[in-house]
Amino acid sequence: MSKVYVVAAKRTAIGSFLGTLSPLKPGELGAKVVKNIIEETGIDPANIDEVIVGNVLSAGQAQGVGRQVAIKAGIPYEVPAYSINIICGSGMKSVITAFSNIKAGEADLVIAGGTESMSGAGFILPGAIRGGHKMADLTMKDHMILDALTDAYHNIHMGITAENIAEKYNITREEQDAFALDSQKKAIAAVDSGRFKDEIVPVVIPNKKGDITFDTDEYPNRKTDLEKLAKLKPAFKKDGSVTAGNASGLNDGASFLLLASEEAVKKYNLKPLVEIVSTGTGGVDPLIMGMGPVPAIRKALKKADLKLQDMQLIELNEAFAAQSLGVIKELCTEHGVTADWFKDKTNVNGGAIALGHPVGASGNRITVTLIHEMKKTGVEYGLASLCIGGGMGTALVLKNVK
């Protein structure tokens, strides 16, 4: 079977909720990144075999967000394109699907990523209204809360699953706040030093007062500190420990990779960035959905015949500080490493608590960031993983191509 390479990895800067990117629909956001990838690689879009797009909040965004991305990016009608929705894992599952298709010999060049406008999520009326509503009030549901942030099996917010992990692993509020502040500090340092410049595609947003070029992550909180974090009230549970300050945000953004087989790399004279060595997808109890990376990482490492200790850089999506700390504790126990070892290699440029979590794009965003950091530092192996609402996780093991 062919090796699978990533030959391009790009994303938008991440926008705040109702922030700079909010005027753009997810199809438009994604298309801007895909178009940039095509231009930078010089690949003829007609040679792309398929486009796979993770997207969670599709209701009201018109037919086929994945297809919208492809057509708006100038990819010919003859190239198939489709969407994938496994909640937060969508942007990474698109990569896993592309990887599998190339391995199976069904494709040679695949664009895979994710796009999300949480700002653009609509409100939903119950389907029963189609049968006639004779009297009494009607309640609209928030598409974002219902379809991205609420557990379908216990009708609880994702924040409660983080509270469950905090309780199970005895993770204190102080530990969570310290973790969150560390994420903010690292992200701000990365933004200010231009660390993300190579991975970000500038997005031009039409404005009556003049077009805006958006090329810098706008979500990091420069005004926070431990004292301010400590004053925040629990967001999901009375006397709980999960707050708006130690959880990820609601965000907009898009992120994509171009994957290629060995044959395509040679045929089109492409330059590989990394090889995708293995993938993993696993499941856990939905009540502790944030622990999903643990089985996913276990599977990915086993397939790669590698140990956690072989990973020199790790991107772990920070849905919640409690969730991340729970995963770190479990992985340290399972793989015989210390918490300090793990934290030194993980999210070195900050994570979703600081940068944001556009749900359909995040799994791809952490992969893009990991790839660029691997190229900058020259490390051999990297690992990316994230949790998924409903109790799952996905993971990728990457190898630097030097």
What are these regions (language model features)?
Residues 1-24, 36, 140, 226-291, ...:
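Condensing-enzyme catalytic core mediating Claisen C-C bond formation in acyl metabolism
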Residues 10-12, 23-32, 40, 175-267, ...:
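N-terminal extracellular/periplasmic Venus flytrap/periplasmic-binding protein-like
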Residues 84-116, 166-195, 256-263, 328, ...:
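Active-site-proximal alpha-helical scaffold in enzymes
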Residues 161-163, 199, 207, 277, ...:
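Active-site pocket-lining segment
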